[in-house]
Swiss-Prot record:
Provenance organism: Ovis aries (Sheep)
Compartment annotation: Secreted; Membrane
Cystine pairs: 111-118, 277-281, 320-356
Protein's recorded name: Renin
UniProt cross-references to CDD domains, sorted A to Z: renin_like
Description of how activity is regulated: Interaction with ATP6AP2 results in a 5-fold increased efficiency in angiotensinogen processing.
Pro-peptide positions on chain: 18-59
Gene Ontology, cellular component aspect: extracellular space; membrane
Entry EC number(s): 3.4.23.15
Cited InterPro entries: Aspartic_peptidase_A1, Aspartic_peptidase_AS, Aspartic_peptidase_N, PEPTIDASE_A1, Peptidase_aspartic_dom_sf, Renin-like_dom
Active site, per annotation: 98, 286
GO biological process: angiotensin maturation
Reactions this protein catalyses: Cleavage of Leu-|-Xaa bond in angiotensinogen to generate angiotensin I
Length: 400
């Protein structure tokens, strides 16, 4: 072998032990905001009644009969957003980066005046962009809390300093709930092409096609600092995982359903007893969701083990004095137990020091999409998460 070939081979082997070249990463800084649920509580809304209404709506949407993919997130509890630019010059939007979906959409200046939720958000104006290209194809995306409708357009989209030509949705019908009180404008799906409504190529796939990233991965960090929880957010890293955000090594789990960030779980245990999912079940790792959710019957069993009281199918509470004595909950993924303590799954309400809400919700999604569990920000805050498109796997490491 020529000397240069030997040196190249040795260099290639050595890169496995070198620290990540963090300078090559593209970063999207995230901000944490009060969730829609928190805003509704502050306004005295009966969350039990609202939960019942949305449960009924979920049933009437007939998810299993839809030809379009169903997004599992209802955004009631979403707390993290980042900023992107659309158009020339860029129009700035606050978006949720959601691994549970694959489309990008923002409200449009063409939004009907009947939808007052549009009025409080930034609106995309195609007339103000010199790079706009008309498409016009109508689309509908169904969520756990309703649906958004609009039409497709094409323009330049800038994410983490990378600009791509992107087909996206201009939303003209935006539901009052939850979007009237949402602090974000739209959603940027980080899912797979198979999940995209209208056959649209997702933003991340366009970024991968440019070959500007070191690795075909992105990773998500959510801050766990509770002292100034609404002032801190997190970061999405495109092209790798930043060692400053995690400790120990990554443990990887292969995706179980092609074209989805879904993996197989082999049990949910309290203390040392496996209560649920002992024979295996499906779980989606969803950056657009804030809490952990599962089938309502399973959640009720889990809540009984914790001694929690059910306010509605999507909200459970405990006496705040119980928090130090509540047991750990472990989720078994890829042969490893990922454990949350009560400090991880109990939410302390600044307006109520008597009843504390648990970051665990019931959610029934019928076949073929469900039944499925969802691991949201409650889980990701504890375990820094890497989404690996090249190897079709998800990695978890203990967050710093």
């Amino acid at each position: 072998m020529p000397l240069w070939g030997l040196l190249l081979a040795l260099w290639g082997c050595s890169t496995f032990s070198l620290p990540a070249d963090t300078a090559a990463f593209r970063r999207i800084f995230l901000k944490k905001m009060p969730s829609v649920r928190e805003s509704l509580k502050e306004r005295g809304v009966d969350m039990a009644q609202l939960g019942a209404e949305w449960s009924q709506l979920t049933k009437t949407l007939s998810f299993g009969n839809r030809t379009s993919p169903v997004v599992l997130t209802n955004y009631l509890d979403t707390q993290y957003y980042g900023e992107i630019g659309i158009g020339t010059p860029p129009q700035t939007f606050k978006v949720i980066f959601d691994t549970g979906s694959a489309n990008l959409w923002v409200p449009s200046t063409k939004c009907s005046p009947l939808y007052t939720a549009c009025e409080i958000h930034s609106l995309y104006d195609s007339l103000e962009s010199s790079s706009y290209v008309e498409n016009g194809t109508e689309f509908t995306i169904y969520y756990g809390s309703g649906k958004v409708k609009g039409f497709l357009s094409q323009d330049l989209v800038t994410v983490g300093g990378i600009t791509v030509t992107q087909t996206f949705g201009e939303v003209t019908e935006l539901p009052l709930r939850p979007f009237m009180l949402a602090k974000f404008d739209g959603v940027l799906g980080m899912g797979f092409p198979a999940q995209a409504v209208g056959g649209v190529t997702p933003v991340f796939d366009h970024i991968l096609a440019q070959r500007v990233l070191t690795e075909d991965v992105f990773s998500v960090y959510y801050s766990r600092d509770s002292k100034n929880s609404h002032l801190l957010g997190g970061e999405i890293v495109l092209g790798g995982s930043d060692p400053q955000y995690y400790q120990e090594n990554f443990h990887y789990v292969s995706i179980s359903k092609p074209g989805s960030w879904q993996i197989r779980m082999k049990g949910v245990s309290v203390r040392s007893t496996t209560l649920l999912c002992e024979e295996g079940c499906m779980v989606v790792v969803d950056t657009g969701a804030s809490y952990i959710s599962g089938p309502t019957s399973s959640l009720r069993l889990l809540m009984e083990a914790l001694g929690a009281k059910e306010l509605s199918i999507d909200e459970y509470v405990v006496n705040c004095n119980q928090m130090p004595t509540l047991p750990d909950i472990s989720f078994h993924l890829g042969g490893k137990a990922y454990t949350l303590t009560s400090a991880d799954y109990v939410l302390q309400d600044p307006y109520n020091n008597i009843s504390c809400t648990l970051a665990l919700h019931g959610m029934d999604i019928p076949p073929p999409t469900g039944p499925v569990w969802v691991l949201g920000a409650t889980f990701i805050r504890k375990f820094y998460t890497e989404f690996d498109r090249r190897n079709n796997r998800i990695g978890f490491a203990l967050a710093r």
